Amino acid sequence: LHKAIRRQRQMCIRDRATMVAFGTASSSATLPLTIACCEKRGISHKIASFVLPLGATLNFDGSALLQTVAVIFLTQAYQVPLDPFLIIQIALLAIVASSTCAGIPGGGLITIALILNGMGLSPEQLVAGFAFLFTIERITDMLRTTLNVTSDTVVAATIADNENEINYDLLNNPQAYEEIA
């Protein structure tokens, strides 16, 4: 398992699907290429075609991370007192809200507004904070999508390894990486 995850981490760095995810900022648009890259690297079609679409639909860990950080940043900027319980509540709300995001560019921005709405900010502060987040949205969206696609491939490799549905000859073949990238 450790060997599969270590090799998967290396292959995600120079993966065409990761580059397309970064450029398009869309998990859904990257999905066919992600499946193809995983299959060329030795993950069985059965695992890749089940796990990756499920991950592209539900696994938005990059969005959950950004939503948590953005809400905490804006509440601190407007001097809203945060106790540990509220920070945990923000993180849990972000995890739940991120699973409702669409896998399209800008899909996570709306959920940030929903979480901010419950933090006791005035309407003017909400608009100003949302405007600030909107200015950096494209850059953060590209990074979030790259993280989402990378974590989907790691989960697929882990499940394939547990189910003995991974071809280590393809996984350890450096020429397969050059053909894809």
Functional labels for PLM-detected ranges:
Residues 1-13:
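Single conserved hydrophobic/aromatic residue that forms the stacking wall/gate
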Residues 68-181:
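Transmembrane alpha-helical segments and their short flanking loops
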